From Swiss-Prot:
Catalysed transformations (reactions): GTP + H2O = 7,8-dihydroneopterin 3'-triphosphate + formate + H(+)
Name of the coding gene: folE
Residues engaged in binding Zn(2+): C109, H112, C180
Name under which the protein is recorded: GTP cyclohydrolase 1
Similarity comment text for this entry: Belongs to the GTP cyclohydrolase I family.
One GO process term, biological-process aspect: tetrahydrofolate biosynthetic process
SUPFAM superfamilies with a match to the protein in the record: Tetrahydrobiopterin biosynthesis enzymes-like (SSF55620)
NCBIfam families from the UniProt entry: folE, PRK09347.1-1, PRK09347.1-2, PRK09347.1-3
Enzyme class name: hydrolase
Lineage: superkingdom: Bacteria
One MF annotation (Gene Ontology) recorded for this entry: GTP cyclohydrolase I activity
Length: 218
């Protein structure tokens, strides 16, 4: 049975309470069983497309897809993979904005299972706790590693950091290209989607919000 950290449990419960958790069902199979079953189904899908899986280039594709789905691009569906977060007491009394910009976003659109590619900015005003800067990137990556819609993703990482840091003073900005728009349908290769979410002082104070937006647009 997977062990889920207390931080992961708190974040998950906060998302459920707000109604912004990714729609999921309870998993009853272990990873090996899920990989094996996905591999079998992907073999059927590829054959229905007319691909010859006896070809050297294709014969391992069902296995590669199953492993990629479970262990990599959808690993964020399993809270046992939530990054280990150690909050540090804010003994230096840091009171200025902490901003991490240009965090790489690579996720998967839950409507068509194609790529979402973009950048994320995360800012917060420390109160009692601070966290290591790399942990911010890791939390963003965790929520990217699941089928997503950008609006929900933005709200999820806002709530996650508010929960971990025990402060409402968090701001999120996401700018991304959606390959469901770029490579199919309208096939618009130039457009991008921007979403943002603000809490606490970022929501209540226009000047604070303006400072954040000015910093990320420099």
């Amino acid at each position: 049975m997977s062990i889920i950290s207390s931080e992961a449990q708190k974040v998950r419960q906060a998302l459920i309470k707000k109604g912004i958790e990714t729609p999921t069902i309870e998993l009853t199979q272990d990873k090996d069983s899920r990989r094996a079953e996905i591999q079998q189904h992907m073999r059927s899908v590829l054959e229905l497309l007319g691909l010859d899986l006896r070809d050297d280039s294709l014969e391992e594709t069902p296995h590669r897809l199953a492993k990629m789905y479970v262990d990599e691009i959808f690993s964020g569906l399993d809270y046992a993979t939530f990054p280990k977060i150690t909050t540090i007491e804010n003994r230096m009394k840091v009171s200025e904005m902490v901003l991490v910009d240009d965090i790489t976003l690579t996720s998967t659109c839950e409507h068509h299972f194609v790529t979402i590619d973009g950048k994320v900015a995360v800012a917060y005003y420390p109160k009692k706790w601070v966290i290591g800067l790399s942990k911010i990137n890791r939390v963003v990556q965790f929520f990217a590693q699941r089928p997503q819609v950008q609006e929900r993703f933005t709200e999820q990482i806002l709530t996650a950091f508010q929960t971990i840091l025990e402060t409402e003073d968090v701001a999120i900005y996401v700018k991304a290209t959606h390959f469901c728009v770029k490579c199919r349908g309208i096939k618009d290769s130039n457009s991008y989607t921007v979403t943002s979410a603000f809490g606490g002082v970022f929501l209540d104070d226009r000047e604070t919000r303006k400072e954040f937006l000015n910093l990320i647009h420099k």
